[in-house]
């Protein structure tokens, strides 16, 4: 088992645990970023969980992204996606500041777009995007949260497509 595979498994575990705890405590959030405020309402110091989680995702995703992208002219997509995730994590107060709102929003959109482009053109596991879209749409419909948590579900499609495309590369 390579360091890159171990690192992506750690990132995946962090993502799943963070989301599982957030959903257990608060229900399905409007967006992943909204958990910053939900944790902050619970206890002020808990707001740090969101930025730390975003930082750890990048730290543990990058080895896999770089290894898979090593021979690709599109390796920069991994850096752009990572940069977007880092900016989202460092500008978590998107409801409190106009500047943070812009940085956060554009970074979140960029991170998702660049990650999905990486999945399509570098990982070659483009088929994970429609698969996860269908699975997540079904979950959102069954939980009746497709309207209230649309952003969260779209973010989940991007993250799950990225994680599974990396795992496919290493495990198949």
What are these regions, as identified by a protein language model?
Residues 38-41, 65-73, 96-102, 144-153:
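Membrane-interface helix-boundary motifs at transmembrane edges
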Residues 4-8, 70-79, 125-132, 151-155:
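Membrane-interfacial loop-to-transmembrane alpha-helix junctions, especially the N-terminal start
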Residues 1-68:
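N-terminal topogenic module of multi-pass integral membrane proteins
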Residues 56-58, 110-118, 135-141:
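Hydrophobic, membrane-inserted alpha-helices
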Residues 77-131:
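Membrane-proximal helix-loop-helix units in multi-pass membrane proteins
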Residues 17, 58, 86, 164-167:
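Hydrophobic residues within the alpha-helical transmembrane core of Major Facilitator Superfamily
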Residues 38, 42-45, 49, 91, ...:
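Outer-pore/vestibule module of multi-pass helical membrane proteins
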């Amino acid at each position: 088992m390579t360091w890159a595979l171990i690192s992506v498994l750690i990132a995946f575990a962090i993502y799943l645990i963070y989301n599982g705890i957030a959903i257990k405590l608060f229900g399905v959030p409007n967006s992943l970023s909204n958990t910053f405020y939900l944790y902050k309402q619970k206890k002020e110091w808990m707001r740090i969980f969101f930025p730390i989680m975003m930082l750890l995702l990048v730290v543990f995703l990058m080895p896999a992204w770089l290894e898979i992208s090593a021979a690709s002219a599109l390796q920069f997509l991994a850096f752009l996606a990572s940069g977007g995730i880092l900016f989202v994590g460092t500008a978590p107060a998107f409801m409190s500041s106009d500047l943070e709102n812009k940085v956060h929003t554009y970074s979140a959109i960029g991170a998702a777009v660049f990650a999905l482009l990486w999945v399509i053109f570098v990982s070659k596991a483009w088929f994970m995007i429609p698969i996860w879209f269908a699975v997540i749409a079904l979950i959102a419909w069954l939980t009746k949260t497709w309207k209230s948590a649309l952003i969260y579900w779209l973010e989940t499609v991007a993250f799950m497509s990225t994680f599974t495309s990396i795992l496919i590369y290493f495990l198949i």
